[in-house]
Amino acid sequence: MKLKRKRHTKKRYISFPVPCTEDMTFQDCELAILRQAVDENDDQTKKKNANSEEVKDMISMVEDFLRKTQCICYGGTAINNILPEEAQFYNRDAEIPDYDFFSETPLAHAKELADQFYAKGYSDVEAKSGVHNGTYKVFVNFIPMADITALHKDLYKSIKKDAIVIDGILYTPPNYLRMSMFLELSRPNGDVSRWEKILKRLTLLNKYYPLKANDCHKVDFQRQLDSANDSEKLHFVIRDSFIKQGVVFFGGYATSLYSRYMSRDQRHAVSNIPDFDVLHEDPEKCANEVVEQLKKQGFAKTKIILYDAIGEVVPVHYEIRVGTDTVAFVYKPIACHNYNEIQIEGKKVRVATIDTMLSFYLAFLYTDHDYFSQYKERLLCMAQFLFDVEQKNRLSQKGLLKRFSLSCYGTQPTLESIRAEKAEMFAKLKNRRSDPEYEEWFLKYNPGDKSAMNKKKKKNLKDKKTKSSVKTKKNVSLKSRQFRRKSGFGEFLYA
């Protein structure tokens, strides 16, 4: 009897390329390999460009320009550069920094920087208007090197005073950088694809430059009344009028609604004092409605004061006074600001999210108006309190503490609306191209074109002089021949 031999078959182990997984089809795996190759190639190209001597020289020129002009750097590059080296998020070996900076004369500075690059031998240089009016971009060899933005003179002065100076370059102070990030996180109709990146940067900034205020236990979170008005009655008349008009609360009253999250030391300061800051699409109409209600309730000495916008940071607003007391400010929204809705005494009340409130409070810190200046410590303490509340409850997505709410109030400027505005301005200015306003809106400046034009003018002038010289010589020659003919030499000369 023959014994059957057992056949030992080796197990086959299928190895997958690194980007592929076992559940992928052949085609998906092939595409994954292709994408990996593309990414590797892209990384190598970026590293090569970022480390080229030409790009290093271009970056150095922008930094020297910042030192010379004392413009103030903001945005991602500013956040990155004020952080400790180990916390910086830009990879200088693979990324070319795009410098954003504020200027009091952005158009002139854009042209000046472009001229400097051209004078250094860079032929492809262009300064042009950005999407937003007041921003100008400088491109060198088709690489965006600088975004130069106009800033209201009062804001510029305040920011410059608190700027961080590193290696001779001015960087926007942390609270203003923080404000701009809170503003972006409070606009759900804006570019939400940037939110994750912004939150990461905000977290880093908060870690190394925490929001701090001094002696907040001595600071009242609400404005106190100077006169003998019936403060509690005033409070409820104004509050109810605002609720009826559907405003979004973000000032002293809104902060008082967070009192349940305050420590005992802070909680005692909250009372029914008329202290309101609100958002309304038609602030003048809203303020007039409040004044009308106040007069009905016997408060005759009322006054409304209009304040202009401060750049694009603090919107146009109206102050409501009763006697000598300021009881409310009504602001026009500058974007679509998010809010949460809660119930108070059976009424729906809109309260700004903490991100919205912080964006306004931190902006107010940099204004020079007296009514903001006298309350700077209060604003900073309120901002610190709200910031601490948000940090401790940042995963609590309910009630007042809900973050990244999609409900928002106001009109958000879109790319389409900005382009429509530019198209309208072009139609208005197209026949006035020499007008400074046209250049302000539609700058397209190429130093090479200017140089070529100057050469052409010189050539035309030279040609004109040459023609004039030839014409003069012909006239002299003709007069000479005429003279010789008259004197009898003509026959001899032309025989």
Residue ranges and their predicted role:
Residues K2-R7, Q70-A78, I82-L83, R92-E95, ...:
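Compositionally biased low-complexity segments enriched in polar/charged residues
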Residues M1-D57, V165-K233, K455-K467, K473, ...:
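N-terminal regions immediately upstream of nucleotidyltransferase
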Residues M61-L66, L113-G121, I238-F242, V290-G298:
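Hydrophobic, Leu/Ile/Phe/Ala-enriched alpha-helical segments that form helix-helix packing faces
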Residues Q116-K157, Q293-N338:
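Conserved catalytic core of two-metal-ion nucleotidyltransferases
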Residues P17, M145-S227, T326-N454:
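Active-site and adjacent loop segments of nucleotide-processing enzymes
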Residues L107-E112, E284-V291:
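Short, conserved charged micro-motifs
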Residues V55-L107, K233-E284:
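Active-site nucleotide-donor binding segment shared across nucleotidyl transfer reactions
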